[in-house]
Amino acid sequence: MVSICPTVTVQNRDEFDSQLALTASLTNRLHIDLSDNTLAPRSLLPITAMSWPKDKQIDLHVMVMQPGNILNELIRSKPQLVIVHAEAEGNLYELAKRFKINRIKVGVALLQPTPTSIVMPALDLIDHVLVFSGNLGYQGGSSVDMTLLSKVSELKYAKPSLEIGWDGGVNDQNIADLVRGGVDVINVGGYIQNASDPLQAYAKLKTAAGII
């Protein structure tokens, strides 16, 4: 079943509390962005300043060049999924091992220019691949690049059980195309957070995606 995950992308605790309260009122699975200005062009609220209700399923998108530097903090926060970048530095196998030991699923994000061949050798370790079509570190302002759906097809062919996420430019006019293209988890930021009625915006997305 397709999941629509509202995203939380903030630089301070007040924004975090506000966006978390909004997104948590919509669904149980949430996508939270982390950035230290090494991979994405700006810093976001650090993981050590975050907390969330224990009954929520949290996906952490780690836009950090050296994710190993915050490995212990990531594990202590107890998300259900941690997504590191294929473009980051460090040993993915070691990171994956530590996450798996702590019952955390392993995800890898691919920026637009990054081919799927980068992650193919590690698919046995990976639970989730995030196809990124947005502006790294920001909410809204991006458009969907439908040519990136070819990555979804390539990954699903290589590992049919792999969960595929999408991040960037999603709205009620294009979400159905992403669902038809094989995307399992659709992360949505600006369309929800910037809406005059976020609850109605989320409902429109569900209807357009065919989620009852």
Descriptions of predicted regions:
Residues L130-N135, S142-V185:
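Active-site/ligand-binding-proximal alpha/beta "capping" segment
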Residues M1-L81, E89-N91, R98-K100, K105-V106, ...:
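Conserved N-terminal beta1-alpha1 strand-loop-helix module at the mouth
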Residues L71-V84, V152-K156, I164:
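Long, low-complexity, intrinsically disordered polar/charged segments
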